[in-house]
UniProtKB/Swiss-Prot annotation:
SS bond partners: C28-C75, C38-C52, C53-C98, C73-C112
Keywords of this entry: Disulfide bond, Lipid-binding, Signal, Transport
Signal peptide: 1-24
Role noted for this protein: Plant non-specific lipid-transfer proteins transfer phospholipids as well as galactolipids across membranes. May play a role in wax or cutin deposition in the cell walls of expanding epidermal cells and certain secretory tissues.
GO biological process: lipid transport
Protein known as: Non-specific lipid-transfer protein 5
Sample GO molecular function, one term: lipid binding
InterPro entries in alphabetical order: Bifun_inhib/LTP/seed_sf, Bifunc_inhib/LTP/seed_store, Plant_nsLTP
Organism: Lens culinaris (Lentil)
Keyword Transcription regulation: no
Record bears the keyword Transport: yes
SUPFAM superfamilies tied to this protein: Bifunctional inhibitor/lipid-transfer protein/seed storage 2S albumin
Family stated for the protein in its record: Belongs to the plant LTP family.
């Protein structure tokens, strides 16, 4: 548990440093806060928790403009890069497992500039 919290803090700090946001865009702090309950699933754990899916749905609702969606994408891309044991299949499957559709794949290789 302590290790998960430490990793979540590292992800939060990395997102704030690596992905500066345009004015008015969703913040990396909000993205990582919403998705921090997903860390166990993203590193190969069992299916996403209700708290994780709640965060995914909250993030989807908050990212309602193209700049917000691009900012959220960049934050998730940066966060994914900093998770050393990221299970890429779980990351890509997360939205579907939570019953939502996002307009891009959660991946370190996603081109967030193409997100509309």
């Amino acid at each position: 548990m302590a290790r998960s919290m430490k990793l979540a803090c590292v992800v939060l700090v990395m997102c704030m440093i690596v992905a500066p946001m345009a004015e008015g865009a969703i913040s990396c702090g909000a993205v990582t806060g919403d998705l921090s309950p997903c860390l166990t699933y993203l590193t190969g754990g069992p299916g996403p928790s209700p708290q994780c899916c709640g965060g995914v749905k909250k993030l989807l609702a908050a990212a309602n403009t193209t700049p917000d969606r691009q900012a959220a994408c960049n934050c998730m891309k940066s966060a994914a890069s900093s998770i050393t044991k990221l299970n890429t299949n779980n990351a890509a499957a997360l939205p579907g497992k939570c019953g939502v559709n996002i307009p891009y794949k959660i991946s370190t290789s996603t081109n967030c500039n193409t997100v509309k």
